[in-house]
């Protein structure tokens, strides 16, 4: 019989984030695997604490980026509680499996022989934990959900937004895992480090081109949020090749730029549409700082115009005027640029007049 599969349905800030599916290594650590499996199904009823022996409704209470995410304290919710199906604590079963890669399930503890219900999922290799914590499973699907949890904002390692195991359970042998295949054609892991396929430069170019095309489809439909995600994802894959040297084909850097620059510019337009003005400023600045030999005049014009538009929305009229003037220099005939430049100047003049009147009243 194959190893058990279990799942968590995760919410972040009360919004569904997705499902994580685990394999439990019953063949190597049967007692530890059974504890986790039963806590996913809740089949053991109430524990000695008077709380249900179940992960359902419990939090990920401790998250450390580039290390691990920790949960399983369903009694106290802060890392001080939890309970196993065998009583409060049980012994370390064995240390056969090592913390040699991300997405492993391992038992949290307070020292030897103190396993309860708390667990963690590694997000990087953590060999310093070998011989101290029992590895008992791995993530099969839902790596992007783990990364979303890992990247949550925290204060003293606790997520600012509640990250909750809203539902959990066991999947029968042969049962569908409940994770829908991507409908938009995006079959790639959210982060390149988690992508198990080839990642040579030409592979990355192909992936990024596909993601950009998917982003463009969303953009044309007016779905700017999903379009933005695809453009950012494409950029993440392109960043797998952060630098170029004399050993690279001469045309390679240009091929990367030909995809990356449009992704940045499209992301900046999405940011404008979504009201993410600081993000728009950041992304367009990245474009303007790009190696100039790969920037077309229209790229520069778009970047200045969109950055100016973002600054207008944050009432930085002087900054907007500066950017619109630079866009106007690149394309003197563009009526839209002329209009926004005049608008920015009028807004700045009105602001100064208002400030002048306020000062006059103060000293009247």
Curated annotation (Swiss-Prot):
Domain of life: Eukaryota
Any one annotated GO CC term: cytoplasm
Keyword Isomerase included in the entry's annotation: yes
GO aspect biological process, one term: protein refolding
Ranges of the TPR repeats in the UniProt entry: 208-241, 261-294, 301-334
Class of enzymatic activity (EC top level): isomerase
Catalyzed reactions per annotation: [protein]-peptidylproline (omega=180) = [protein]-peptidylproline (omega=0)
Record's keyword terms, sorted: Cytoplasm, Isomerase, Repeat, Rotamase, TPR repeat
Pfam family, one: TPR_2
Ranges for domain PPIase cyclophilin-type: 7-170
GO molecular function, one term: cyclosporin A binding
UniProt-recorded name of the protein: Peptidyl-prolyl cis-trans isomerase D
Lineage of source species: Eukaryota, Fungi, Fungi incertae sedis, Mucoromycota, Mucoromycotina
